[in-house]
Amino acid sequence: MKMANHPRPGDIIQESLDELNVSLREFARAMEIAPSTASRLLTGKAALTPEMAIKLSVVIGSSPQMWLNLQNAWSLAEAEKTVDVSRLRRLVTQ
């Protein structure tokens, strides 16, 4: 089963920053993280953690659960593109 395209969390964060007219440095400062960490988050090189989700809920809005759901949906969609399950078989009772 092919999943729909899910937005990368970093893209959603970037859209919010653009709407707020906030720079990467301002965002990093508000989140109390290094600018390099903020950059990795926005580019998808770092996954959104529960700690980041809590901070995002305060700094940008929405719930921590929404941010984690977004990350999980995107991560699962990406994994489905690369994980080869063709040789796997379901375990059954005998």
Curated annotation (Swiss-Prot):
State whether keyword Ion transport applies. no
Matches recorded under SUPFAM superfamilies: lambda repressor-like DNA-binding domains
Domain of life according to the entry: Bacteria
| Keywords, comma-separated and alphabetical | DNA-binding, Transcription, Transcription regulation
Annotated HTH cro/C1-type domain residues: 13-67
Q: Care to name a GO molecular-function term for this sequence?
A: DNA binding
Q: Does the keyword Transcription apply?
A: yes
Feature: DNA-binding region = 24-43
In the record, the note on similarity to other proteins reads: Belongs to the VapA/VapI family.
Name the UniProt record assigns to this protein: Uncharacterized HTH-type transcriptional regulator YddM
